[in-house]
């Protein structure tokens, strides 16, 4: 009799688990229809896209080129004045954003992996003035410290806050994962600086002798998505987990986001990371996470009027599955997820001035795709 009860209980638990799992997966169909139009092609590993006031697009290519592309898809010659990058592994010319005061300054801000000698390199951020066919008056405003002998996990996304300060995401460079938990370096951190690279008031560790003053939050792995929520005005980021455990976070001043102490992922090939914890006191939980990994890259909040059904949604690119991921939000929570099949590695996601989404595909013949609901 006891054995029968145990078997019945096990069967009921298995059925319940299957139902819960199925309901969760129902929010994540393998594909859904989109109208997809190719705008441009012939880009080598494009990494980031920014819209200029005239509607043209400024695009970075990882080998170290920056181009201007018009609405018909015509590619300019590479702009002169781009600094030399360390094009190796995951490194190269990476993110680009416009100065919030671009109309008066003509400044663009961009990130790249910079050689530091002795086979070391680091995430570097600079600004320059955009002339017709070149960058002028370049100034470096941030250099990741310390430099590392690694070609992985540069992070490198940039986002301007409403107060004009600049958030920079920095990966832990893979070989420095334990340093994501210490405050005397920039590895595995979100950094906050002024437009000139100075330390703004309100940085949580400013004035501490054991911490770098530019730090905003810590315990990150490799954040390759960053955007300001236009409704809450908060910074949102996403980061790559190891094998599983990609995360979306809302980094707050001075908070610890756990890597590599807590994670929903595991070692490549299987096995615990550290003690195998996913929760620990004093460490923040993600807003959303993915197991298995989707390899997120690029993110954009939809705050345009062309497609009302998308209003208030967050869109994230997927390198691993060739998807565009739509997240429906309620406040600071993710309520549901939908996946659109793009068929290519999606490196960046931006909302265009026309209300369409624009995607960059990560490939040797990279494309700009314009997408909307069908």
Q: Residues of each region from the PLM?
A:
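Acidic, Gly/Ser/Thr-rich repeat motifs that build Ca2+-stabilized beta-propeller blades
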Residues: 16, 20-176, 225-228, 233-241, ...
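Internal hydrophobic scaffold segments of catalytic domains
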Residues: 180, 231-264
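Beta-propeller blade signature
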Residues: 123-133, 182-196, 250-252
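Hydrophobic helical h-region of N-terminal Sec-dependent signal peptides
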Residues: 9-17
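Conserved blade-ending motifs and adjacent loop-strand segments that build the rim/top face
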Residues: 220, 333-353
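Bacterial N-terminal signal peptides that target proteins for export
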Residues: 1-8
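Loop-centered beta-sheet repeat module
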Residues: 184-193, 202-235
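Surface-exposed loop and turn segments in beta-propeller and other repeat-based domains
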Residues: 77-91, 138-154, 195-216, 260-291
